[in-house]
A protein has these predicted regions:
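Short glycine-/acidic-enriched loop or helix-start segments at secondary-structure transitions
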Residues: 19, 73-76, 98-101, 205-206, ...
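Short acidic/glycine-rich loop or secondary-structure boundary segments that cap or lie
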Residues: 136-139, 188-190, 202-205, 229-232
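ATP/NTP phosphate-donor binding region
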Residues: 1-65, 72, 77, 81
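Catalytic core of DAGKc-family lipid kinases
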Residues: 9, 40, 80-192
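Glycine-rich phosphate/pyrophosphate-binding beta-alpha loops
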Residues: 132, 136, 195-209, 274
């Protein structure tokens, strides 16, 4: 039987170079599986997108070596290019929540996944996992900036992330005042977290949306109303085992379409990356999500 051909895109920016270090092991596993491997290490997000589209026309099997954001960018480009082959994820990022869902949903299911779409003004993006406002954006921004300037601190990412949660809350950088319009109701208030997701895990392993399903045509919308720092930390700790839903500050809804209207312009994080447009980080007053 002839070897199957696979094209692999490697994102060297994932987790400060973790994908590059992990690739030799993945390459050995693929070679042992009798794959003929063509790999390419990208130089930028633009280069990654260009080669994802190019690979869509060259290969029936495409591998992505990187984190959640690498996978969702690839899915976006491959979907646009009409790719109907097999997508293989080789997880090597700082955030691998999508992998946790893949492992958890190993039971035979329909092969078609729903992609989410988020739009704000003229900017839109397809995604596999989730979009969130509030705490996740603030922590992403602080941790990313610190590790970019001091990459030697990467082994302490967990501690840095916890401190970022504390400072974000104390400085009110997590605060999002919003109206959330769902299929059948509208939620309003001050929130620390607004999450619209089709995967169960968030924030590097928290079981935040236990009923989310990317085979279903609806988002699971999870919100945490702003509360004390101690209560917020208790909620996040409880989310390890999905017990956060027992707190009155936490609400869970399902909706196929979601509109988030903000009192003041704010950024959104989509599958681990803050959404950007040609001018840089996008800050909108209204975001729409649909499947």
């Amino acid at each position: 039987m002839p070897a199957r051909k696979i094209g692999v895109l490697i994102n060297p920016a994932s987790a400060g170079g973790r994908a590059v270090k992990a690739w030799p092991e993945f390459e050995s596993l693929l070679a042992a599986g009798d794959f003929e491997i063509v790999s390419y290490t990208t130089s930028s997000e633009t280069d990654f997108r260009v080669h994802a589209r190019a690979f869509a026309g060259r290969f029936d099997i495409i591998g992505i070596c990187g984190g959640d954001s690498s996978l969702t960018i690839a899915a976006e480009e491959l979907f646009s290019a009409g790719f109907d082959g097999e997508l293989v994820f080789l997880p090597a990022g700082s955030v691998n929540d999508i992998v946790l869902d893949i492992r958890e949903q190993r039971a035979p299911r329909a092969s078609t996944l729903w992609l989410g779409e988020i739009s704000a003004g003229a900017t839109s993006k397809d995604f596999i996992g989730q979009a969130n406002w509030g705490l996740g954006v603030a922590v992403n921004r602080q941790v990313g900036a610190l590790l970019h300037s001091m990459p030697f601190l990467r082994p302490f990412t967990g501690i840095i992330g916890f401190l970022a949660i504390v400072f974000s809350h104390l400085l009110r950088r997590d605060l999002v005042s919003a109206s959330i319009h769902l299929d059948s109701e509208t939620l309003e208030g001050d929130y620390s977290i607004i999450l619209a997701t089709q995967i169960r895990h968030w924030a590097s392993g928290l079981r935040f949306a236990p009923q989310a399903d990317w085979y279903a045509p609806v988002f699971e919308v999870v919100t945490i109303r702003r509360c004390s720092l101690v209560k917020l930390i208790r909620i996040l700790l409880a989310a390890r085992t999905a017990r956060h839903v027992d707190f009155p500050e936490v609400e869970v809804h399902q909706s196929r379409r979601v509109k988030v209207s903000l009192a003041s312009a704010a950024a959104v994080q989509v599958d681990g990356d803050i959404l950007r447009d040609v001018a840089g980080e996008l800050k909108g007053l209204e975001y729409r999500l649909a499947k």
